[in-house]
Amino acid sequence: MKFGLLGRTLGHSFSPRIHSALGNTNYELFEREPSQLQEFFANPELQGINITIPYKVNALEACDVVDPRAERIGCVNTMVRKDGKWHGYNTDYDGFVFTLQHAGIDVSGKECIILGDGASSATVHVALEDLGAKNIVHLSRKTAPFYGDAPNYYETAQIIINCTPIGMYPHNPANLIDITQFSKLEGVVDLIYNPRRTILLLQAEMMEIPHCDGLPFLVAQGVEAANHFQGESFGTKEIEQILRDMRREKENIILISMPGVGKTTVGKALGEEMGRTCVDVDHELEKEIGAISTYITEQGEPAFREKEAEMIAKFGTQTGLVISTGGGCVTVPKNFAHLRQNGRIYQLTQPVENLSTSGRVLSSGGIERLRELEATRTPMYESFAQCIIEHNRNAPETVAAILEDFEANLL
């Protein structure tokens, strides 16, 4: 018996990992063209398949028996062969409902906006109806109301769900609408999971509004599909364990601090402890521009900051890294989104009297210059950081403190 994921262009998929974690190691990826679908569905070796874009409607049409909820939504993402007949389900529905619960977002009686008009948006619409949403509006590129009509809902919308790929890697940090203008907003969901935090979610985080990316959606729908495939009753426990493991593997750890605090040392120690690649942004820059002090002297600090921002943008799109930044990266506001999109940011601190200025052109001038820098930059560091760690030159203790916080904030 074969299980797997059907799509036209799959690339990297988390689905095999999800199903393997639930005991199904016989899960494959099936890339097929539209002309191959009839033959594919007729393959007697197939026992269960998940379906992704663009074949969810085709899957519904290929089913002999369709679950009423999937029929209502108008598409199928899970097919199981029973007694020689294909039975179709929509477990994306379950994934979305779990995501709302996971984020603590209550849609009952709320005014909701869905961005997009594809298969996922149809699923989300039905789920919102079933959960008692008061009113549901779709904003679209193709038909009215359009994305540009978002201002019409600034005073009424309470929940926003993005069902489009806008903002997904490698096109991050693109964004459809500015949610900071919505005065009654209570919850935001973005079904994108790479990056973990799109601009939409970074804005929600800044506004201190409950929000969630698409990874819980992906994992929960996969677990519900596995229940159909394997006849099991997997639930929240399994979803959260898989989600935690994937977060642990993917979330970057970002180190920021005053120059000379010890980011490089701590970063290397973290990399060794976690078995991760440690990226030192200053070292990567020097491979490209030569000595930083010379570059700043000859080209000026603004030119250097632009080079630094380009390097941060490059590594910020990647996952599973430890990233040690330069001391002044926080002076460029756009660096925050590039660092935070896939990472948790840690500010390392220690008394300014302990800091070295050797070889650091921007902090030369002794203790008074360092105090000036500290006074200017401390609010910037604090605005970037999710956690502040006192580093007393004991790298193992600092690493342990970071890892304790990291583990506690995976979900």
Per-segment meaning from a language model:
Residues E240-R248, A269, E273, P379-L411:
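NTP-dependent small-molecule kinase module
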Residues K2-A103, P195-R197, L201-Q203, M207-P210, ...:
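Phosphate/diphosphate ligand-binding glycine-rich loop within oxidoreductases
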